């Protein structure tokens, strides 16, 4: 399985302290999304010579910066990861620096390529190329963040977002 060789203490920490933070975000960025990105990231990681513990942590932290707003969430997520002293039990300062960069680089709508393979893995996993899921999450995000829009404007916003992010 994907979690077979995962450090159990790290996994317990993420499950108890990090993933619950996603419960406060819109449905498109809730715990289900975080778990999907973790699973997809670990599945992709099997094809590369990478540290699976790092991939797991990067995926777990990738959207926690939404606590401070959407626009710079990728930067805030990196700051939150780097400031989490608990991670020093499992990772060196150099690994944490790479992880921070990967979290900062994960954003699919970013105008630059991720700096490392870790950023590329999580960015790709976060894209979630399943069309029905993409549309559902885009609609959920719109309803949660733009409640003033009527049905027609929600549809227009959805199409604009999908065109910008995936076209």
Q: Which positions does each model-derived feature cover?
A:
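An active-site-proximal "capping" alpha-helix that borders the catalytic cofactor pocket
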Residues: 37-41, 72-87
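An amphipathic alpha-helix signature
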Residues: 11-15, 38, 54, 78-82, ...
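Hydrophobic, well-structured mid-protein blocks that either form specific transmembrane helices
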Residues: 79-115
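Short, small-residue-biased leader/transition segments that mark boundaries at the very start
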Residues: 1-2
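Short alpha-helical hairpin
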Residues: 6-20
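Divalent metal-dependent phosphate-bond-processing catalytic cores, especially two-metal-ion Mg2+/Mn2+ enzymes
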Residues: 8, 23-50, 61, 110-167
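His-Asp-centered metal-binding catalytic motifs of divalent-metal-dependent phosphohydrolases/nucleases
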Residues: 52-69, 73, 77, 97-108
């Amino acid at each position: 399985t994907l979690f077979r060789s995962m450090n159990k203490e790290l996994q317990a920490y993420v499950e108890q302290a990090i993933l619950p933070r996603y419960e406060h975000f819109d449905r498109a960025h809730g715990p289900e999304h975080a778990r999907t990105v973790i699973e997809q990231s670990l599945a992709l990681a099997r094809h590369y010579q990478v540290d699976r513990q790092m991939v797991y942590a990067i995926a777990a932290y990738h959207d926690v910066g939404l606590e401070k707003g959407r626009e710079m969430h990728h930067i805030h997520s990196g700051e939150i990861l780097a400031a989490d002293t608990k991670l020093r039990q499992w990772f060196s300062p150099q690994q944490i620096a790479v992880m921070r960069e990967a979290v900062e680089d994960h954003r699919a709508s970013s105008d630059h390529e991720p700096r490392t393979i870790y950023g590329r893995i999580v960015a790709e996993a976060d894209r979630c190329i399943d069309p029905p899921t993409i549309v559902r999450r885009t609609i959920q995000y719109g309803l949660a963040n733009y409640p003033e829009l009527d049905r027609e404007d929600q549809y227009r916003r959805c199409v604009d977002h999908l065109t910008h992010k995936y076209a």
